[in-house]
A protein has these predicted regions:
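Charge-rich alpha-helical segments
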Residues: 1-98
Length: 98
């Protein structure tokens, strides 16, 4: 079984700067500057999610992309969320998205 982590443990993980964490979910919003850039980031997120078999909720608007992570099977944050958040943030940086 997957073990939950606290919001503090999530925030201490590498690469998750800019993410907000609560008891059951972590989220961030990226400013993408264009819809096409947002779609490109979603494609990167999709590949990372498939690789990790861990799938975030994403909400793309014209120039923003909001990503929410939670381990639904236990209704809490886990190390899987922190790891994927760090990978998503790295993908955003690679695309020049903040």
């Amino acid at each position: 079984m997957v073990e939950p982590i606290t919001a503090e443990e999530f925030r201490a993980a590498p690469g998750v700067e800019g993410w907000e964490a609560g008891a059951t979910e972590a989220s961030t919003t990226f400013r993408t500057a264009s819809f096409a850039t947002g779609v490109a980031l979603i494609n990167r997120i999709a590949a990372l999610a498939e690789e990790a078999n861990h799938h975030p909720d994403v909400d793309l608007r014209y120039a923003t992309l909001t990503v929410r992570l939670s381990t639904h099977e236990i209704g809490a944050l886990t190390a899987r969320d922190a790891d994927l958040a760090g990978r998503i943030s790295a993908a955003a940086r690679d695309l020049g998205v903040d």
